[in-house]
């Protein structure tokens, strides 16, 4: 089957061919014709499945038949994923002079408002920043959203979690009713929130929702080419163990992502490893967007061998050739573990994952093993004597210096200031009402 067989526009066929995308993946072959037929869609979207084209191709095909106003809105949980999706839209639509606006945090709101006012064909946004514009930028700016034809929730399982609830509600209020638009959800796992949407009554005049390969929790699997292991350590020496793993003969040249749960931890580790002469970059929410983008570019290009990241890097991002994933902090949700380790062992390649487990993490590890139906192996490359001899003293000294530097610089103050500003804007908006 070809993209032509799926009903994609001729100009888009040429764009796909220019990008050397010639044959549709399973999710593309099944979803594209159904979306073109006017159906809402819930699609299973494993890493590397080609899900962006699965929704972008039919949206852009229908847009080219009636290119008027803001045609589609794509909501996604992270800034980096929004930028990546926008790049694909622009590449696909270059021959048609497509206009795409990226509306994410960390960028100038006034500049964004002016872009939205120009009615770009597609808006790619994070819910929080779009909600800010709806609340504060006025109907002249966001009024075009009332007439969109498509709404896409990418990484829908995460977007429909409690952390995005209030922002999504504000975004949905300005959009056309569900009966007057197509809604496309792409998700890696079926949460209760996604399942509830799947089972909702179909609005009058609409076709039944199309479902593609939804993976239930009891079918969760990790790649066969991925080795998963752990080390069990006291919490106060976790950084020393991390350093020893990264400089061990097995991993000293490996491209690695180290996942943590907090921005503060990410910054400490970045500074500590840099002092220990490891080429390192970081990615977390307290970094300015320009620095976040630069970190990703450096890691992709190999200028940084190690990326320290919170879960903003765990989903959807196209980062090829990651050989090792380290869980410096163990995630509370087993699905987050799956997304993290899914950054390696992609497309049949081999990859490794190491979880650094302390006494407080045991229940989380057991929950993960139960979820993936597989036991982790003990990592043999590190042992207590080796850590004490090679890493503990130098890592402790580097960490102490890093913490002192962060205190001098007032790390974390920007987040507090931004939080106060958001609270003030919300109060002002309520007063105006």
From Swiss-Prot:
The protein's enzyme class: hydrolase
Biased composition (Basic and acidic residues): 401-427
Motif Q motif boundaries: 1-29
This protein's record includes keyword Nucleus: yes
GO MF, one annotated term: ATP binding
Function: ATP-binding RNA helicase involved in 40S ribosomal subunit biogenesis and is required for the normal formation of 18S rRNAs through pre-rRNA processing at A0, A1 and A2 sites. Required for vegetative growth.
UniProt protein name: ATP-dependent RNA helicase DBP8
Organism (species): Meyerozyma guilliermondii (strain ATCC 6260 / CBS 566 / DSM 6381 / JCM 1539 / NBRC 10279 / NRRL Y-324) (Yeast)
Source lineage: Eukaryota, Fungi, Dikarya, Ascomycota, Saccharomycotina
